[in-house]
Amino acid sequence: MIISVPATSANLGPGFDTLGLALDLRNIVKIKKSRFFSISIKGEGANNVRLKGNNLFISIFNEHYRKLVGKTDKFRFTFINKIPLSRGLGSSSAVIVSAIAAAYAMAGVAIPREKLLNLALIYEPHPDNITPAVMGGFNVAVVENNKVYSLKKEIPQSLKAVVVIPNRPISTAHSRTRLPKRFAMSDVVYNVSRSSLLTAAFFSENWEMLRVASMDKLHQDIRMRGLPELFELQKLALQKGALMSTLSGSGSTFFNLCYESKAKELAKVLKDRFAKYQVKILDFDNKGLIIEE
């Protein structure tokens, strides 16, 4: 059984805990029944001993598999990780979604995507990452009475993502503690209006509108102060062809959306200026979770 889940970029500027999209950078898990339990990790996290001893995927997988079949069995797990850890690209959501999907698949029980999404909400209470991880594409998602309500829009191949990945991780939990408990009404209105406009821009494919619609006054500046060069990065990206330039999740990755014709030029400019950072040109992913026999 092979399970794969895409990377995600959430918040997208003003859409705090609400907006997210999927990127064509996947974590893959291969699972086989075995006489012995074993874990093999390739790619991101391969040298992290803690991931083998205290593995979130295994914990969630065993919890759901046991509920479905009434016992635990031994499996050989091979993880091929392409999503950087703790960089704001949804690595935790990918683990959660793939673990639940894998448990149901190995138990031989079909699970609708909507149900899987709501089970994932138990471990990740903010739907902006888990929703595109499951559904693919651009998603607007809210939680009401512990249930996710979401709408998806596929993203055309004429657009590309240029992501800039610093060599420094940022903890989402720690990042949240830096945010204020209260916000000015004018700033809240600013964000509500722009997140609404950004959603409309995606669904109507009015990409030029994103330059205005992706602005934020609630969280990005506070989070970016921990890595001040991100302010320069954002300004440079918007000058050199990005339609929007936003902190990806809580960071440290910066997400830039542009037309395909601008992607290589934008990536080169950013790589030349921020030589110590990884710069990747990525397609958008419209499939989300994939399960293969």
Swiss-Prot record:
EC number: 2.7.1.39
Endpoints of the signal sequence: none
Subcellular location: Cytoplasm
Recorded GO CC terms: cytoplasm
PROSITE patterns in alphabetical order: GHMP_KINASES_ATP (PS00627)
Catalyzed reactions per annotation: L-homoserine + ATP = O-phospho-L-homoserine + ADP + H(+)
Keyword rRNA processing attributed: no
Pathway: Amino-acid biosynthesis; L-threonine biosynthesis; L-threonine from L-aspartate: step 4/5
UniProt record similarity statement: Belongs to the GHMP kinase family. Homoserine kinase subfamily.
Database matches in HAMAP family: Homoser_kinase
Protein's UniProt name: Homoserine kinase
Organism: Nitratiruptor sp. (strain SB155-2)
